[in-house]
Amino acid sequence: LKIAKPFIEKGIHIICDKPLTATISDAETLKKLVDKNKIIFALTHNYSAYPMLREAKKIVTSGKIGKVNLVNVEYPQGYTVGIKKKDEKKTLKWRLDKRISGPSMILSEIGTHAYHLLRYVTELEISELSAEVNTLSKELTVDDNAFVLLRLNNNARGSIWVSSAATGGENGLKIRVYGSKGAVEWL
């Protein structure tokens, strides 16, 4: 918000990387500023440009697999396993500072990719959720693991698991969509 606000107020269109903001309050303020100043504000989500994910979206939204019943998205990584405060890489600093990354680093850092992938491929909305968010890496003060159970707006069920504490995990983004007539998965 702090970086985008002066540009928005000058009427400059913006392409922004995630996380959008660290809090819902800041996101709501940002939306009001964008609407008031009538600018284009785009949030990047690089995975939706992958040709195989675009194909998966076509298959799912065309009805080829029938009514979506189950969706599973996971994104295991291991970049915080064994990290020590004194060994933090510069690239990790914003992620490991709650004031910058927000109350849940893992959801703002890679959870946003999992959420976007679910919405992009299925075009469904989350209507209800239950989450367990925790810190598995002892040296951290931010969350590095999250399990989220979902109910989607077509009454399908889903889950999202994201972690930076998955030893050996490296960019393991996956989505599975199970319908009444078939399934699609991208691994």
Label every model-predicted segment:
Residues 2, 6, 29, 55-58, ...:
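Alpha-helical elements of Rossmann-like donor-binding domains used by nucleotide-donor carbohydrate transfer enzymes
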Residues 10-12, 37-39, 156:
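A short helix->loop->beta-strand "cap" motif at the edges of active sites that frequently abuts
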Residues 16, 41-43, 72, 186:
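Hydrophobic residues in well-ordered beta-strands that form the structural core
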Residues 29-47, 67-70:
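Rossmann-fold dehydrogenase core element
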Residues 90, 109, 113-187:
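Contiguous beta-strand/loop segments that form the cofactor/metal-binding neighborhood of enzyme cores
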